[in-house]
């Protein structure tokens, strides 16, 4: 019997995964996914800056210093947070995504980090992403509103999945 994998849109068997459409979230319509796909290269180009600002922000909090007190911890945060943010803009909410989010949650729990701290840090990342959207969209207010709305939606989905 084939193993079954549940995603947001479908239940797929291992045999048809290669040809099945990539799973996504029902709240992400085609227009939202398109905006996020267009914004992903902006994030990718500036990911090192985004992560550096994130690390500077969280290292000021005693509760977050546990994760940023060693070179190994910083390297891990830099790598994993950067990868995670870029993956969000791919809108791939599949079994791999949920496994990664689960591992991140376990790492937070193991470090004794309460949700209020990492959610607060995520709020700062959201601020940085909105700043990038402002740069990206320029004077096009309608596009900016749509892009920020798409960013908010994908971040909300991610936070709810943790």
Predicted regions and their residues:
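Short, well-structured alpha-helical interface segments that form or flank functional binding sites
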Residues: 45, 49, 53, 76, ...
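Charged, low-complexity surface segments at secondary-structure and domain boundaries
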Residues: 34-40, 65-70
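Structured interaction and signal-relay segments at domain junctions
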Residues: 54-55, 59-89
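Long, amphipathic alpha-helical coupling/dimerization segments that relay conformational signals between
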Residues: 2-31, 42, 82-162
